Structures are given as structure tokens and as C-alpha cells.
Amino acid sequence: MDYAQPLAFFAHILEQKRLVTALEGNASVIDRQTGLTYVTPSGRMKLLLEKEDICVMNAAGEQIGGRGRRSSEYLLHEAVYQARPDVTAVVHSHCPFLTAYALRYQNFDVPETCSLREVFTHFT
């Protein structure tokens, strides 16, 4: 399956729900059957991403698709995928709410949640 479109859609949701700000944060999905990893590009507003912007990486770590430059956090995502074969998606959000939590060390409720499974089910 080509995960570029659902990942771009999910990136829109991340920004609409204010889980990322400005150019911060990134997300990826790995297709365990093909070995391809789809990752949001670096330095781009998530709300403006299109399918063609999503970077496609092969198992050797080479970018084989996408208009953008892969996220600088790509290697972090790959480390998660290697360490946890049960994980198929990673979101590194720089969420303002979690940043505030880290600064204040207080409990709080995150106002929005979003499931990658729900997003990707819509496209399958």
C-alpha cells in the first residue's frame, strides 16, 4: 500500500489539532511488507503537505520518492522501527501541551487525541 496520502492527511490533522506548531514535529509509517518508510519532509508546514511531498525511504535509508527533504529525525524513527517490530508508525510532535507539561511537571488532560489506525483505515 502507498502510505503517502494517508500520512499527508494525518499530518494535516496534527496541525489542525495543534499537536504540532510551525515547522516542528514529524511523522512516519513503515510498510513492513515492502520495507519502505514514509516520512514527512523537513521544514514544511504539515497543513500544506500533499501526497507528493511525503518522502519515501527504502530499507537502505535512501530517499526514493517525495518532493521534500526527509525529516532530520528520520534516523530516530528508524531506530524505533528496528527496536520494536510491532510498531508501524511514529509521531514526534513537539506538542505545545507536552512542552508545557515538561516545563511545569503538572498533570493535564490532552484535549485531542487522534488515532493513526482510524486515519489509515479510511484509506484502505
Where are these regions (language model features)?
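Glycine-rich flexible loops
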Residues: 1-124
